[in-house]
A protein has these predicted regions:
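N-terminal Rossmann-like NAD(P)+-binding domain of SDR-like oxidoreductases, especially those catalyzing
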Residues: 1-152
C-alpha cells in the first residue's frame, strides 16, 4: 500500500510513518521542515525513518499547489494521512496569515488532490483546539466545534 504522510518530520508523523514502514507499506513523506520547532529535531526524526527502503521524502510546503499535485501524480498513493499544520495556539493569534496559508490553503491542496486522484482513504489528524470554547470536559468527538478560539 502506498501512503502519503504529511507532517512526517513531526512527532506523530514520524511514529506513524515508522509503524507503516514496519508493517510493509510504502510511505511518501512530506514536510517543509519549518523552524517553528527545532529543524535539527525534525531532521533527526527523518534520519530514523530514512533507513527504510520503502520511504521517500519530499521537502515541500503543502501550500505549494503544483508541487503537491506533482507528488500525487508521480507516486500514485492509495491513502493519505494528513498531519501537517502550522503548530502553536498562541502563535496563531499573533500570526493568523501563516495559519490561513498552512492550515486552510494547505489542507485544501491536500484534500483536492485526494479527490482528483481518487484516494481510497483519507485520515486527518487535528487538535483538541477544534473544540474551542466548549466547556464540557472531557471533550468528545460528538461535541460542537462551532466556537473556535483561534485559527489553530
Amino acid at each position: 500500500m502506498k501512503i502519503i504522510v504529511t507532517g512526517v518530520a513531526g512527532f506523530i508523523g514520524m511514529h506513524t510513518a515508522k509503524y507503516l514502514l514496519k508493517r510493509g507499506d510504502d510511505v511518501i513523506g512530506i514536510d517543509n521542515i519549518n523552524d517553528y520547532y527545532d529543524p535539527d529535531l525534525k531532521l533527526a526524526r527523518l534520519k530514523e525513518i530514512q533507513k527504510f527502503k520503502k520511504f521517500d521524502f519530499y521537502k515541500v510546503d503543502i501550500v505549494n499547489k503544483d508541487e503537491i499535485e506533482n507528488i500525487f501524480f508521480k507516486t500514485k498513493p492509495q491513502k493519505v494521512i494528513h498531519l501537517a499544520a502550522q503548530a502553536g495556539v498562541r502563535y496563531s493569534i499573533v500570526n493568523p496569515d501563516k495559519y490561513i496559508q498552512s492550515n486552510l490553503m494547505g489542507f485544501a491542496n491536500i484534500i483536492e488532490n485526494c479527490r482528483n486522484f481518487e484516494i481510497e482513504h483519507f485520515v486527518y489528524g487535528s487538535s483538541s483546539s477544534v473544540y474551542g470554547g466548549n466547556t464540557l470536559l472531557p471533550f468528545s468527538e460528538n461535541h460542537s466545534v462551532d466556537h473556535p478560539l483561534s485559527l489553530y
